[in-house]
Amino acid sequence: MFILASQSPRRRELLSMLGLTFEIITADIDETMDPALSVEDAVAQVCKKKAQAVGASHPDQLIVAADTIVVVDGRVLGKPHTETEAKEMLRSLSGRSHTVMTAFCLSRGDRFETHVEHTHLRFRELSDAEINAYVATGSPMDKAGAYGIQDQAAIFVEALDGDYYNVMGLPLCALTKCLRRWGINVLNG
């Protein structure tokens, strides 16, 4: 049993798929990334702040927090705030390669373990009609980079190198290795 410090329905689905038991308590923090840090360090810092915020009121519980971003040409794409911003993000990814980074942090009390997973993707060229139709579904609005690989945006992905589940918001292979070190074994392996 642990606490998932995330409101992401995809993270909840992925952990449930593994048969893990957890409670959800969301962290209310400022998710602004520190521009003085590298992108990888900044996303890890945001993730650690989520774990610390929830852990402050649950010091004896194992906390799992995560944060996902998309990086294209050194530019960080978080969740779009408007449909116009979602369309701009998708245009910036069209026909290009990008990296999805998900940081996760396990914590209990003063002990922390943080990991950042990278998955590299390439989108095919997207037409304005496809972008408009996809944004009209509403799906992009709660996702970093304005797309969900597990939904209709799957048809945009021309190539993928790395953990597919990382793109959904939680790199399951890396996470379960860490969970094992914290005493939680999936499939009792």
Where are these regions (language model features)?
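Cofactor-binding loop segments of dinucleotide-utilizing enzymes, especially the Rossmann-like FAD-
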Residues: 7, 27, 109
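Generic structural marker for isolated residues within well-ordered, non-membrane alpha-helices
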Residues: 11, 30, 51
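A generic short alpha-helical patch detector that favors 3-5-residue windows
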Residues: 20-21, 148
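A short beta-strand-loop structural module common to alpha/beta enzyme folds
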Residues: 23-31
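N-terminal beta1-alpha1 ligand-phosphate binding loop
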Residues: 1-20
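Anionic-ligand binding patches
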Residues: 2-3, 37-189
